[in-house]
Amino acid sequence: MQGEEEGLSRYRLRPPTPREERLVEGFLRAIGFKVNPYAEGMTVLDPGGKFKEVFYLPWGLRRAVERLPLHYSAGLNLGSIGERGFRPSLHLARELAPLCGSPVKCIRLSPRGEKLFLYSRDVYGDNIASHTSGAALVVGSNGQPLGWGVGLSRDGLLIVKPLRDLGWYLRRGG
């Protein structure tokens, strides 16, 4: 029983390291924030695998969660940290969608562009209603969040490359 408890002890939320804070803050700056709005409540779940999950847990809930013997998740899932850095979650996309345009950088797609994006395909030209360069929240023609992408321009052609889209749940996320 003691070995089992020790194995489960890794499922505890902890404060982020300075490196983890920098990765999340770097992403938030890239999409338009001047400061990290989640800095005071960021927590990390590091079960020892390839990825660490990053959550925002308001201070009012922190004491209640700390009393629990096991943490799987708590609060708003901001994303994960892996070998390639910080990867924002779809939960964060939904949370930030109302801030599209100010301060959050957004790319808006046409209905056809939405379909391409949700199949994790690059979106080009007329399928992009509004474009910005770099990492951005991608929304549909109705303003609903579709995921995260990168806006590019090559030889005058606008391109959106998906980073994570809602279709991911059907393809890989289970």
Curated annotation (Swiss-Prot):
Q: Which domain of life is it from?
A: Archaea
Q: Name one Pfam family in it.
A: pre-PUA_NIP7
Gene3D superfamilies attached to this UniProt entry: PUA domain
Q: Name one GO molecular function term.
A: RNA binding
Q: Which family does it belong to?
A: Belongs to the UPF0113 family.
**Record's protein name:** UPF0113 protein APE_0516.1
